[in-house]
Design a protein with these regions (language model features):
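Extended active-site neighborhood of metal-dependent phosphoesterases/phosphodiesterases
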Residues: 1-84, 109-119, 134-170, 179
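Active-site neighborhood of phospho(di)ester-bond hydrolases with catalytic His/Asp-centered motifs
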Residues: 89-92, 118-131, 142-145
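Short, solvent-exposed loop/turn segments at secondary-structure junctions
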Residues: 97-100
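A solvent-exposed, acidic/Ser-Thr-rich amphipathic alpha-helical stretch
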Residues: 104
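Short, surface-exposed beta-strand-loop junctions and turns on beta-sheet-rich folds
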Residues: 174-176
């Protein structure tokens, strides 16, 4: 699908000025992903078992996560960004935090990785149409409201970025945020 959408790969990053935008693929490891008979199927099974052990409430068939390979790529990329003094925004389909019925299967591992780097300024996600917001070790994590269930109301946000400020201007039922 990503090729049909002219995306460079399943997960990727791009740089604009002193900002790096990282697009995670939280649909990579999922019940609906084409992973049967591959090493990713083992990762799926491992994630499900770990979630059951911690009594996580997000081990549902509509959620997904990222592979160990993608996690290693993310860690290497963040390390480079930190070293170069760049600022980073993270984007994913599934919420990373706070935990909900719609969270990424390995969201805890992802936010632990993000929190190691001061270059990460915020993370944005969707999937949970009600929206959500939380801080994880000083990183704002924003789940943007959806518009699927709101036929007569729109929801989108415009993000304005400057050297020392991040402004999320919610429209319709979308929330607004401001971060320094």
């Amino acid at each position: 699908l990503y090729k049909q959408l002219s995306m460079p790969s399943e997960y990727y990053s791009f740089k604009k000025g002193d900002w790096v935008f990282i697009m995670l693929n939280t649909n990579e490891i999922a019940s609906y992903a084409n992973i049967a008979g591959t090493p990713k199927e083992n990762e799926w099974n491992r994630m499900q078992e770990q979630i059951k052990q911690i009594k996580g409430k997000y081990a549902y068939e509509w959620n997904g996560g990222i592979s160990e390979k993608q996690m290693q790529w993310l860690d290497r990329l963040l390390k480079k960004c930190e070293k170069k003094g760049l600022s980073v925004l993270i984007f994913s389909h599934h919420p990373l935090y706070p935990q909900s019925d719609f969270s990424a299967l390995n969201g805890n591992e992802i936010v632990d990785t993000l929190s190691k780097y001061s270059c990460v300024k915020a993370a944005f996600s969707g999937h949970h149409h009600a929206g959500a917001f939380g801080y994880y070790k000083n990183i704002p994590l924003i789940t943007l409201e959806g518009m699927v269930e709101t036929e007569n109301q729109n929801a989108y946000a415009i993000v304005e970025i400057s050297q020392d400020h991040l402004l999320v201007k919610g429209q319709g039922r979308a929330s607004s945020y401001s971060f320094k």
